[in-house]
Amino acid sequence: MFEQPSSTTNTTTSSGSGSDSNHYFELGPRNPINQAHPTSVIVPPRQHHHQIHQQQTDNSPLTPCTPYYPSNAYGLPLFFGTDFLQFQPSDIPSPLTPNISSPLTPHPFGPIPAIPTNQIYNRTFTDFYSTAASSPMVQYSTVKKSSAGRKPKEEDNMEDDDDDKRLKRRQRNKEAAARCRQRRIDLMKELQDQVNDFKNSNDKKMAECNNIRNKLNSLKNYLETHDCKLSREERTHEINRLIIPPSTVPPSQPYLQHSLRVHPPRADSVPYSIRSGHSSSSSEQHSPVEDYKPSIDQLLLPPISCIQNIKDRNINSMPPPALPASTSAAGIHVITSIPVSHANSLHGRSENVFAEPERKIPKIELDQTLTSLTMPDDVERPSALPTLSRIVENQPITTPSRPFRLGGEYQNQTPQSTGNGLFGGPPGPFDLLSSNTGLTPSGQPTMNFVSTPTPIQPHPDADLRPL
């Protein structure tokens, strides 16, 4: 199991009290790693128990409490447990630590006796292990622990810091959980409030629906039990009687007027009402005849050609459609429109005519021309334009004559010539340039003016279109 010791192994023998001696064997050289802890083994010889007690009484430099076996950093033997696997002979090179030989230092308790190598290598590992375990001399070493590593004070500080962090993290988790629970409670409360509001609104709408349904049922019952005063024939007769007849006013009539001839009501009668069939004092039910209203198809409007110019009529009125004069429940005529009286009519008397809103003449906006932009502002429009006179006068018309050659000489055909020529003119040579050709005026022409009715003063109904 063990190899031969190297050259650096020191083997010595010392005699103790008695015939027997203890053999000491140093297993390997000391290196910087195991220098603090000596790795030596004390192999005591086989002897009786009384000899062991006798050796303890001698004044030997070697004390039995000093262990000489391989130990680890905590002072425990390497052969006890699984740490013996870490033990390596000194001759086997280690890949982690170089094999550096160092001189042996003497043992602090004295010289270490050498152990014969033949006794070590001849013994088995189990025998050696049992001998070392059963020997009462083997005791644990009291070597001081190394101070390498963290100090206890720093470890305490680290533990305190870890505890503080753990407590803070736990406190934060508690606060976060409390906030989460509060948010859930608030959300549930808000949802419950919404549910209550919806329930209340639903109850209100159900009550409204029930109320409307009750009203509908009451109206249906009223219609089913209602008895009309007029029969079907009477209703048909009244409706046929109220049909508007066609208009008999000719379109060529210069003046159109229309008014309702109704008898004035009595002093104790119902006042006028715009809507027929509704009075402030009548509380009884009215028949459909009194609430009759003509549709737009039954209204007969006069044609546009019947409306003449405002200068001819001097009034702006338009006849309304012929509306029937209804009768109220009290038997009093109620007009459906209010007549308007005009004092300044053509006939010089006030008549009831229907007022018509004045027609709006659209304004025609013309684009500005280049002439209007270049003309000066002081140029005014003339009040009259010169035109031809209406009096028929004899105006000479000069036209170019046709010269022709007669007998080797040119003759001029002019209607003004009164001689012995072709047209009564004097015979002789004809000068075309000295005669009137009609291309250029021979005298100042007479300009006649024709007066046109151009409006000078502005009038709201005047047509101010450009000439």
Swiss-Prot record:
Biased composition (Polar residues): 434-454
Region (Leucine-zipper) location: 212-219
Places the protein is found: Nucleus
Any one annotated GO CC term: RNA polymerase II transcription regulator complex
Annotated GO biological process: anatomical structure morphogenesis; basement membrane disassembly; cell fate specification; determination of adult lifespan; innate immune response; negative regulation of stress response to copper ion; negative regulation of transcription by RNA polymerase II; positive regulation of DNA-templated transcription
S-S bridge residues: none
Record's comment on post-translational modification: May be phosphorylated by kgb-1. Phosphorylation at Thr-440 increases sensitivity to heavy metal stress. Phosphorylation inhibits homodimer formation, and promotes association with target promoters.
Tissue specificity field: Expressed in anchor cells. Isoform a is expressed in somatic gonad cells that neighbor anchor cells. Isoform b is expressed in vulval cells, the uterine cells that neighbor anchor cells and the spermatheca.
Major subcellular site: nucleus
Keyword DNA repair: no
UniProt cross-references to Gene3D superfamilies, sorted A to Z: 1.20.5.170
The keyword Repressor appears for this protein: yes
Segments for region (Disordered): 1-38, 139-179, 266-291, 395-467
Keywords in alphabetical order: Coiled coil, DNA-binding, Nucleus, Phosphoprotein, Repressor, Stress response, Transcription, Transcription regulation
Substitution effect: residue 440 to A: Decreased phosphorylation by kgb-1. Loss of phosphorylation by kgb-1
Record region (Basic motif): 165-205
Assigned protein family: Belongs to the bZIP family. Fos subfamily.
Function: Developmentally regulated transcription factor which binds and recognizes the enhancer DNA sequence 5'-TGA[CG]TCA-3'.
PANTHER family, alphabetized: FOS TRANSCRIPTION FACTOR-RELATED, TRANSCRIPTION FACTOR FOS-1
The protein's name: Transcription factor fos-1
Lineage: Eukaryota, Metazoa, Ecdysozoa, Nematoda, Chromadorea
